[in-house]
């Protein structure tokens, strides 16, 4: 868990793209809500599960980045921004509500909606992200729980019909750069639902006085449990369509010769007119851990950690057998973990 200051000055409100709040080294598809990837290899997301969602890492909520608030007064933040012409518009909607029931117990709701109609044909993206969180941080017992929903709809245009469409400065763009999958109406829809709860109980090895705000600076042993349910799915749809390349080749006189009836996909199986392909992945994770604190967290030996874990994986994707049988086949796998570590302070 990382403690972050609450930005009440709206210092970064003008930065629509979330990855620009960390730096400028990102390769983005282009518009708000669309996929991006850091140039720095060491900053790239490394998903052990749900790798097909890595491109939207800067937008999605996860167990690791769900915010929790500890407030003296109710906090409410609402924002709506839009920019660009109507046919290329980008929209950014943000809603945050936080309130403490008691000095140690609070809840909050965060909702983000970011999207664009895009500068190219068939490039609209809608990115919706919701987190609902509850926390309690007492002297000995603490619990953090949350629900996450990520929903992403993106149109897949397949790229420009030819490099000339973006390289030739004499080419006018009255209604968007022509793309290969515009007539195919290709879309990808991502859905994610997750629930998690992480709790721990501290057993101090020295008496706790009224002046002790917490037992973080006392010798103590912490026993904890972490549970997470996380499921992701992706559905791809399209219809069989063609595109035209107005500059497919040149004739003997050097003039451009157009070519129509071009297809993005060369082969069509099962259904000759449309496609529906899906993938689903679910992980149920359980962890039990213990943490010994011989002196305090800033001591020569800060903490000695250890624990065990069990992950239950479920996978399914559309295959030819699924079409013949009329149902999806699911594959289940289990992962077991035993881990330990020692944290210390450099002198």
Question: Predicted segments — roles?
Answer:
Residues 1-194, 202-217:
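Membrane-proximal, glycine/serine-rich, low-complexity loop/turn segments characteristic
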Residues 59-60, 78-79, 114-116, 176-185, ...:
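Extracytoplasmic loops and strand-loop junctions of Gram-negative outer membrane beta-barrel proteins
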Residues 79-83, 112-114, 148-150, 202, ...:
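Outer-membrane beta-barrel pore domains and translocons
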Residues 95, 132-134, 197-199, 286-290, ...:
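Membrane-embedded beta-strands of outer-membrane beta-barrel proteins
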Residues 120-126, 156-162, 235-242, 316-324:
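Outer-membrane beta-barrel translocator domains and adjoining extracellular loop/strand segments
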Residues 121, 236, 259-306, 313-325, ...:
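Long, acidic/polar, low-complexity amphipathic helices and coiled-coil-like
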Residues 162-175, 237-272:
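Surface-exposed loop/turn segments flanking beta-strands in extracellular/periplasmic regions
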Residues 345-346:
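Conserved small/polar residues in nucleotide/adenosyl-binding loops
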């Amino acid at each position: 868990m990382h403690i972050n200051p609450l930005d009440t000055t709206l210092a970064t409100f003008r930065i629509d793209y979330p990855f620009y709040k960390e730096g400028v080294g990102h390769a983005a598809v282009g518009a708000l809500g669309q996929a991006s990837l850091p140039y720095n290899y060491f900053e790239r997301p490394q998903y052990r599960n749900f790798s097909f969602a890595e491109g939207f890492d800067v937008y999605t909520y996860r167990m690791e980045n769900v915010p929790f608030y500890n407030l003296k007064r109710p906090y409410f933040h609402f924002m709506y921004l839009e920019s660009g012409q109507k046919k290329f518009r980008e929209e950014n909607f943000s809603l945050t509500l936080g309130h403490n029931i008691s000095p140690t117990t609070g809840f909050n709701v965060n909702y983000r909606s970011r999207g664009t109609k895009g500068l190219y044909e068939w490039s609209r993206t809608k990115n919706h992200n919701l987190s609902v969180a509850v926390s309690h941080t007492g002297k000995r017992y603490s619990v953090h729980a949350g629900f996450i929903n990520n929903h992403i709809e993106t149109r897949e245009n397949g790229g420009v019909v030819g490099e000339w469409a973006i390289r030739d400065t004499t080419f006018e763009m009255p209604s968007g750069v022509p793309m290969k999958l515009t007539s195919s109406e290709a879309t990808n829809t991502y859905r994610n639902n997750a629930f998690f709860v992480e709790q721990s109980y501290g057993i101090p090895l020295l008496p706790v006085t009224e002046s002790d705000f917490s037992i973080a600076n006392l010798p103590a042993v912490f026993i904890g449990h972490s549970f997470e349910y996380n499921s992701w799915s992706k559905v791809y749809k399209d219809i069989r369509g063609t595109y035209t390349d107005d500059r497919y080749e040149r004739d003997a006189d050097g003039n451009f010769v157009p070519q129509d009836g071009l297809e993005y996909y060369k082969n069509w199986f099962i259904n000759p007119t449309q496609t529906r392909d899906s993938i689903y992945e679910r992980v149920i994770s359980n962890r039990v851990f213990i943490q010994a604190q011989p002196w305090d967290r800033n001591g020569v030996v800060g903490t000695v950690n250890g624990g065990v874990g069990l992950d239950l994986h479920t996978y399914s994707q559309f295959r030819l057998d699924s079409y013949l049988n009329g149902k999806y086949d699911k594959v289940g796998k289990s992962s077991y973990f035993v881990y330990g570590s020692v944290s210390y302070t450099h002198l």
